[in-house]
Amino acid sequence: MNDLAQYAPGPASGAQVRKDGEKWTLILVRELRHPPAKVWEALTDPLHLREWAPFDANGSLATVGATVKLTWVGTANVSETRVTRADPPRVLEFHDIRWELEPLAGGTRLTLWHSIDRRFIAWGAAGWHIAFDVLDRLLSGTPIARIAGRDGMRFEGWQRLVTEYAKQFGADPPNWAPKPAQKS
């Protein structure tokens, strides 16, 4: 891993929400400079997910009907999910997450739909924003360490993104701030 010290997330962009009561759907779009097949592998292979995603999977997400245990980084909670749609390399769907991959000249438009409790929508947007940055660097061959969970919340730039996304979405950010990282 390299370059983490030089990484800083850009401004909040490419996101919107669909509001439905307490459950809101985050829609985040990112254009990546990599072909859909390469992006698909990063979305479905547990070894790749471990490098960039905010969760670990104990198996491949590439097959409809596959039952996979997901563990969100920094939590002890394990949830079992079933892949409900897998059309490589176009659409992947499981639990409350849907990915669409659209080929572009020289890359892929990746769209994420993630249903999130409205109180945490800005957190989700900030977390996925950073995860997409880490994914892009991984696919480019210049990986940096995964920035997720409580470590992600302590990462410089995360709180700024939460504030920017909350303002964009017309949502109040949660009034909880992560504790500073422990010094060794």
Kindly give the residue locations of the regions a language model identified.
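Short beta-strand segments
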Residues: 77-81, 97, 108
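Terminal "cap-and-tail" regions of soluble proteins that handle hydrophobic small molecules
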Residues: 1-21, 105-184
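Solvent-exposed residues in well-ordered beta-strands and their adjoining turns
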Residues: 31-35, 71, 102, 113-117
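Short beta-edge strand/loop motif at the mouth of beta-sheet-based domains
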Residues: 19-28, 34, 38, 45-89, ...
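Short, surface-exposed beta-strand-loop junctions and turns on beta-sheet-rich folds
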Residues: 47, 76, 98-102, 116-118
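A structural signal for short hydrophobic beta-strand segments in well-ordered beta-sheet cores
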Residues: 17, 83, 99-101
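Short, solvent-exposed secondary-structure boundary/capping segments
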Residues: 90-96
